[in-house]
Regions:
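Structured loop/turn residues at beta-strand edges in well-structured enzyme cores
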Residues: 46, 98, 133
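Conserved GTP-binding G-domain of TRAFAC-class P-loop NTPases and closely related GTPase folds
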Residues: 111-189
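Conserved P-loop
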Residues: 1-53, 57-58, 62
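Generic beta-sheet signal
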Residues: 14-16, 105, 141
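P-loop NTPase motor core
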Residues: 55-130
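Short, well-ordered beta-strand core segments
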Residues: 11, 102, 138-140
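A general structural signal for short secondary-structure junctions and capping/turn motifs
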Residues: 2-5, 94-96, 128-132, 142
Length: 189
């Protein structure tokens, strides 16, 4: 739903699970893959300044399911998956121009103590990398009787964070177009 207000030619959508969008719209620039090197090559050639990787968590899951019986050492599988995912984040930061924004959409999970974190696979990403620490902005989607919203900062129980004064409110509409505009205005890009 958060992509709904982008124009058809405003984003490059990387549709990891190759599924239909939850609203009536088709984007002009779509790549259906979960292959990290292919995603990286495509990001270099994309015709827009905004990309969305939805749902990036399935990059991890799909690779694990493909490789789980092929590798004798399960730890090697997790290491390979973790390295691929980490390298995607590093690539985005190092290889793309500063005015290109890549939104990485993922699911979350909540533990027994009500702490919410990104849903990861393997201890490398959960304990060693801290994916949310690799980004400046992490918004969390919540749902209530009024609809879907983004949380812009955390009270310590989840990963929501954004720069000081980027957003006026703690809770904002679940509209990535509005978020994109706010980020570009904040950083002057």
């Amino acid at each position: 739903r958060s992509l709904k207000n982008f124009g058809e030619n405003e984003i490059f959508l990387i549709n990891v699970e190759r599924k239909f969008l939850p609203f009536r719209k088709k984007f002009d620039y779509v790549l259906k893959t979960d292959n990290v090197p292919k995603i990286q090559r495509s990001l270099l050639k994309m015709p827009t300044k905004t990309a969305v990787i939805d749902d990036a968590g399935y990059i991890l899951t799909n690779r694990y399911m493909r490789e789980k019986g092929q590798v004798k050492n399960t730890f090697e599988t997790y290491d390979n998956i973790g390295n691929d995912f980490w390298s995607l984040f590093e690539f985005i930061k190092a290889e793309l121009p500063d005015d290109v924004i890549v939104y990485i959409i993922m699911h979350e999970e909540t533990d027994d103590y009500n702490n919410t974190k990104l849903k990861m696979m393997g201890k490398v990403l959960e304990q060693k990398v801290c994916v949310e620490g690799m980004v400046s902005i992490a918004l969390r989607c919540i749902t209530d009787e009024e609809g879907h919203h983004f949380v812009t900062n955390s009270g310590g129980k989840d990963i929501s964070k954004s720069p000081e004064e980027m957003f006026e409110n703690l809770i904002i509409d679940n509209d990535l177009k509005v978020v994109d505009t706010a980020i570009r205005e904040y950083y002057g890009i």
